[in-house]
Amino acid sequence: MRDFQKQGRSAVFATNGMCATSHPLAAKVAVQMLEAGGNAVDAAIAGAVLLGICEPQMTGIGGDCFVLLTPPGEDRVVALNGSGRAPAGLDANLLRDKGMTTVPLGGPEAVTIPGAVDAFCRLSADFGKLGLKASLAPAIHYADTGVPVAPRVAFDWALSTDALQGTARDAYLINGKAPTAGQIFRAPSQADVLRRIAMNGREAFYEGEVAEDMVAALNARGGVHTLADFANCASEYTAPITGGYGGLDLWEHPPNGQGATAILLLNILKHFDVAGMDPFGIERAHIEAEATKLAYDARNRFVADPDYMTKLDHMMAPETAADLAALINPKKAMPASVPGTEAVHKDTIYITVVDKDRMCVSLIYSVFHSFGSGIASDKFDVLFQNRGAGFTLDKGHPNEAGGGKRPMHTIIPGLLKKNGSNYMPFGVMGGAYQSTGHARFVTNLNDFGMDVQSAIDGPRCFADNGTLKVETTYGPDVHAGLADLGHNVMIPEGPIGGAQAIALGDDGVLIGGSDPRKDGCALGY
């Protein structure tokens, strides 16, 4: 039990259904969908699409999503990959001939086809109850009438305005400036697009007037996108991957997501007595940082479009983790591995919903960087992700940019099982941090017996491209001790990541946790 004289929040308890996400309005709408007879899929789509209006710097219909779900009464895990592909005309040789060494963050070269809309349509048709029109209605309403900008959203928005280009500045700034907390943000053009999707499904987005607007905007900036690229976009069901840690089994998406990195990281940590360490002390932070460097080095070498990746079994093998764990010196930080060419500051939303039939949905949805590419279509203001910046331009690399390929993705929804039964859908937003965030959350639960909210609240650190980012919630002695071990310690500009989770209690009670680093909450009924 937490100390109620200290700042913090309690876990949320409910019996019928629950949502945990990063904005209270989205959580409220999701619960309302459940109360109206919808299931967890209906509610998750409603909340996620609304988050594109509440947190447009993080996500939107120009982005991608990944989903894990468990059908009611079943223990099987369904994985839907809603990430889009590069346009067929993308050619890494041409980019290198232009002098590029990485895919430019704000260029059309970074814009992959948005996959989320197709995934939402497919998910609603295959697993929803109320239909897509019902799920999109709340976002349409609030896009038209507007939402007050939340404090954390305003903080992030102000840091990201330089990314916006051309007509995107008109659509996503108010009088040329980022909105402040409490100002009303409206997106009437997106409401128009969502109405069309509600009436006519995916074709209203990937074909016809909306698609023509998107292709024209990208072509005008030098993009090689075609109407056929959009029409051919299709989400895919895949076979999830899993790994055990203590009494928990972690389920993740296979590549092109980085879920295998989280499993590898936990496999490395198995070789250390994490439970015997101070949960918020120097030793645990050091070992986690070293394991992160090694696991992410493997990710940067191997993770790619599954049609091109050949090393998944190697990443998941216990022998690989044992060999990597042997490289860790408990008394000294190793040099940082060579950074991957994918950029690191990614913005994402996460939503999890559990309904009365105990269907669980774990959904993550993103435009990659804050405001993605910064490019929006001229008529409908669809803001494009820059997920193609996750490609490398290293010739022959499995994640080399190429036409029709999916880039390595950082966004990963998670799901935990206990004793073979569904236990907890969860996610940790935060770009590259997500794999480390998954591992830290799991070890908080398993090794230290933390409840859902405490496992989210605890301080975080992240070994990232030559530095060890350490939140201010760690004491100064930890900062100093890590520096003494050779880490290049820095305090990040903002908090690290943002987590949401819902546990299925043994007595049928749902227990939700939501990260105080965000504006959101867990709500149940």
Where do the language-model regions lie?
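Short, small/polar residue-rich loop motifs at catalytic or cofactor-binding pockets
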Residues: Y237, H345-T348, H409-I411
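Short beta-strand scaffold segments in enzyme catalytic cores
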Residues: T59, G63-P71, I349-V354, P413-L415, ...
